[in-house]
Structures are given as structure tokens and as C-alpha cells.
Amino acid sequence: MTNIRKSHPLMKIINNAFIDLPAPSNISSWWNFGSLLGICLIFQILTGLFLAMHYTSDTTTAFSSVTHICRDVNYGWVIRYLHANGASMFFICLFIHVGRGLYYGSYMFLETWNIGVILLFTVMATAFMGYVLPWGQMSFWGATVITNLLSAIPYIGTDLVEWIWGGFSVDKATLTRFFAFHFILPFVITALAVVHLLFLHETGSNNPTGISSDMDKIPFHPYYTLKDILGALFMMLILLILVLFSPDLLGDPDNYTPANPLNTPPHIKPEWYFLFAYAILRSIPNKLGGVLALVASILILILMPMLHTSKQRSMMFRPLSQCLFWMLVADLITLTWIGGQPVEHPFIIIGQLASILYFLIILVLMPITSIIENNLLKW
């Protein structure tokens, strides 16, 4: 008799994706982050669901409802901080997952990579709208500043912004629709993640060497299921330390002040995971130019397969490209730091240089370095 997991129509799909899946024998811990992202997503949906049971999306009661969750709901404060810091863990895993893809040339799986970029945009949109919901000062002004960027679009910009706001300013209509979108988008993300996985399983996983591993596969279970569980335990440990010891470490104190349209906070800034893009936006004095640079900073990922000039897929055996990759990482950390600083003398020029370097490394230095490496190896 055939095993039920191999014959049952539903179990068969799960079996082929997570149990009997042939996986390369040499994938390192950098390959753990896909499963960690899946765990993060499920976790965020569950905590978000419980928060939505007590939250009200009205400008007069939104702030109070979040306070009520933290004070009066049983373990409401834990759920709230798990959800807020869970978003930070989500983005840490996302950035590492994308970085791994860049380093090991995983972007050569075109469909998987492009759906991944769409996923990144969707997660960023979801996180932004979630940040607006507590209706604190930074929520309100963050929503105002970021949505206002669309007014830079020629001709239709102003109409577009007012259409998104549902009025002439960020108000009740904006908060209600942001809550609706914030609730529905995680399910869209789940669907996209399934498609992402579907395309990945068409080609099979990449591995650190970038060489085909068809002749050396091992079953996903028990080897990688166990490895993923270990990764998940590490992530949960970090998340719990964050939530139970310093839940507000990554937040902004201004968000504990109820939203006031008449009082602008001295430094408007988004959550830490958007600071690199915010720094690129601010480094260009022109509004439209800044918006284009902001979009390009993420959209540039789609160009990666076209910018790949090396004869080797992975950076494992390309020391010059490795140096550039880690320069890019350092540059992104610098941009993240700059994004959180006020717009004054040393920070403006540092931000502008870091922004130029970001695009320069990806568009110019990496492709040229790859050609040099090809010539060094007489390829």
C-alpha cells in the first residue's frame, strides 16, 4: 500500500514541498531564512488577528484602543509587542534573504527572483500601513509625508494623493482604508509566497558554489526540517529577549503621543527598516528626483540578472566581488544610520555620498569587477 502522504491529493503537495523534496547537500545556514520568513508571516497574521479583535480604526479611538490592548486585555501587551517587534524580525530575515540571493547568484532563477521583489514591495507597503494604525504622532506624520510623495508624479499627483487620503488630509477615511489594506495584504503575501515556492521547486534550490547539485541531493526531511527548527528557535529567542526586556528599543517615543495635525514632530522618520530608503530619498533636493531614487533603490533588484557579467554564478570564488558586496552592506548600514539623523551639515553630505555609492556599486562597479575576474581567470 502506498504511503498516505504520497497518495492523498493534499498531502502529496505538502510532501513534495517539505518532506521528500530533493535538496542540495551543501546549503548553509544562509538558506534558513526562507523558512524563517514563512514562520514570521504566520506569526504576524496570528498576532495581528488578535490585535484586530480589540483595535478600532477610528481617529478618535485608535490611539485609546491600542492603549486599552496594552493595559486591559489579557496579555495584550505581549501580543502588541510581539507583533511590532515581529515586523523587525521579518525585515531582518528579509534583508538577509535578499542579501543571500545577491551573494550566491540566486537571482538567476528569474521568476522566483521577480516574485521575490514583488513580495518585498508588498511587505514594505504592509509594514508602512501597519505603522500608521496606532495613530501616534509618528504614525500620522509618517503617513502624511510618505503619501505626499505621490504628489511629485506630474499631472495626476495631487489628485492621486487626495484619492488615497479619501479627503484633503490624512484623516478618518485614510486610517480606515489603511486598516483594511493592512489586514488583507498579509494574505496576498501568503499567496505570493506559495507562487514563489512553486517557481523555486521548478528549478530546485541554488547552493553556495553556484554549480548544479543534481548529482548530490538529500531529502529535505529530516536534514533541513531539523536545521530550520534550530533557526526558528534562535529567532524566537532573539524576539522574546527583545519583547520582554526592551520592547520599545526599535520604536519611536513620539508614537506614544496621540496624533496632532497642528503639531509637527521635530524629526519625522519611519521605522528602522525603511531608513536606508528614506536616506536616499532625502539626499536628493528635488522632490520628484528623490521619489524616483527611492523607488529605484528597491526596483534595482529586478536588474540584477541583467547586470550579472561573471562566468561564475556565485561570489564564493570571486574575492573582488566579495569586497564590493560587503562594501554595499556597509553602505546600507551607513544609509540606515543617516536616515535617522537630522538634516544638517555632516549628515547631508554623508547621505548623498552613501546614496551615490549604493547605485555606483550595483550598476557600475560590480559588473566591471566581474569582467575583470573573468579575465584574471582567462575565461
Swiss-Prot record:
Binding note for cofactor: Binds 2 heme b groups non-covalently.
Highest taxon of source: Eukaryota
Membrane topology: Multi-pass membrane protein
GO cellular component, one term: respiratory chain complex III
GO molecular function, one term: ubiquinol-cytochrome-c reductase activity
Keyword Lyase recorded: no
Binding locations of heme b b562: 83, 182
Keyword Transport applies: yes
Alphabetically ordered keywords of this record: Electron transport, Heme, Iron, Membrane, Metal-binding, Mitochondrion, Mitochondrion inner membrane, Respiratory chain, Transmembrane, Transmembrane helix, Transport, Ubiquinone
A family per Pfam: Cytochrom_B_C
Location of the protein in the cell: Mitochondrion inner membrane
Residue stretches spanning the membrane: 33-53, 77-98, 113-133, 178-198, 226-246, 288-308, 320-340, 347-367
Annotated binding of a ubiquinone, by residue: 201
Cofactor(s) needed: heme b
Residues binding heme b b566: 97, 196
One BP term from GO: mitochondrial electron transport, ubiquinol to cytochrome c
Subunit structure: The cytochrome bc1 complex contains 11 subunits: 3 respiratory subunits (MT-CYB, CYC1 and UQCRFS1), 2 core proteins (UQCRC1 and UQCRC2) and 6 low-molecular weight proteins (UQCRH/QCR6, UQCRB/QCR7, UQCRQ/QCR8, UQCR10/QCR9, UQCR11/QCR10 and a cleavage product of UQCRFS1). This cytochrome bc1 complex then forms a dimer.
General function of this protein: Component of the ubiquinol-cytochrome c reductase complex (complex III or cytochrome b-c1 complex) that is part of the mitochondrial respiratory chain. The b-c1 complex mediates electron transfer from ubiquinol to cytochrome c. Contributes to the generation of a proton gradient across the mitochondrial membrane that is then used for ATP synthesis.
More info: Heme 1 (or BL or b562) is low-potential and absorbs at about 562 nm, and heme 2 (or BH or b566) is high-potential and absorbs at about 566 nm.
Family to which the UniProt record says this protein belongs: Belongs to the cytochrome b family.
Record's protein name: Cytochrome b
